[in-house]
Amino acid sequence: MTEQLNVQQMAEKLLAADNILILCHKNPDGDTVGCGSALYYALLALEKHAAVLCADPIPGRYAFTNPRLFKGEFEPQIVVAVDVASVQLFGEGNGVPQYTRHVDLCIDHHAGNSGYAEFTLLDGSAAAAAELLYEVICAMHVEITPHIADCLYTGLSTDTGCFKFSSTKASTHITAAKLMEAGAHVEELNTLLFDTKSRERMEAERIARNHLEYHLDGRCALIYLTRDEIEQSRVDPADLEEPVS
């Protein structure tokens, strides 16, 4: 059974260790990548050994976050998961299972978190794990640099659909404003994350529209892609996080 921590207690746990492994979930999205990267750079600022491990490659659209990827170069004192609701979400690749048998810390915003970690910072009302991690990094007295702000904004904006989802609250916008004040490149990030599509994504959309169906007396429109069609378009599955528009 996990023990629930508050923000300050989580910050103290992280400050007490020198070698820290950060775990993201498989098929990584903007929140888990953004949090993993932001925490890595915060720990680096404290002159700690840290690295990020994920079962799957970081999607190209998030390459700018550029965390150090774990290659087994140190023995972790603490394993911390970010935006991971259950052990099953870690995946099997990259030797991840070796480090998921005992997860020390978890920072998450999913109300259904299974409580797999020894200690958990959980707020099911938060729009993204990045919203919680921002508070943790501040509690660690680490400066929110422009790059850390970019990473956290990536998590915050992608998990809220660019602040369109119902999970978005006033506090979400306040956190975003603080990240802007810290130097987050919001205009560039919004263009990259929400307005830029690869040629492969455009091809996938073209194929999907061939399946257009109307239901509920025309009030609902449905499109879809089969696995074979995804392979045919050669689209990166990460590029399909956002719905076709």
Question: Predicted segments — roles?
Answer:
Residues T2-Q9, A85-S86, I137-A139:
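Short, motif-level signal for alpha-helix interfacial/capping segments enriched in acidic residues
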Residues T2-R61, F70-I78, T158-S245:
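Hydrophobic helix-and-loop "lid/oligomerization" segment in the mid-to-C-terminal part
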Residues A11, R68-F70, G93-V96, T120-D123, ...:
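A generic local secondary-structure boundary/capping motif
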Residues H110-T175:
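Short alpha-helices
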Residues L39-Y40, V96-Y99, L122-D123, I174:
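Glycine-rich, phosphate-binding/catalytic loops in enzymes
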Residues V52, D104-C106, T120-L121, C220-L222:
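Conserved beta-strand scaffold positions in the cores of enzyme catalytic domains, especially
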Residues K48, H102, V142:
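Short glycine/serine/threonine/alanine-rich loop segments
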Residues A63-F119:
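Active-site cofactor/cluster-binding pocket
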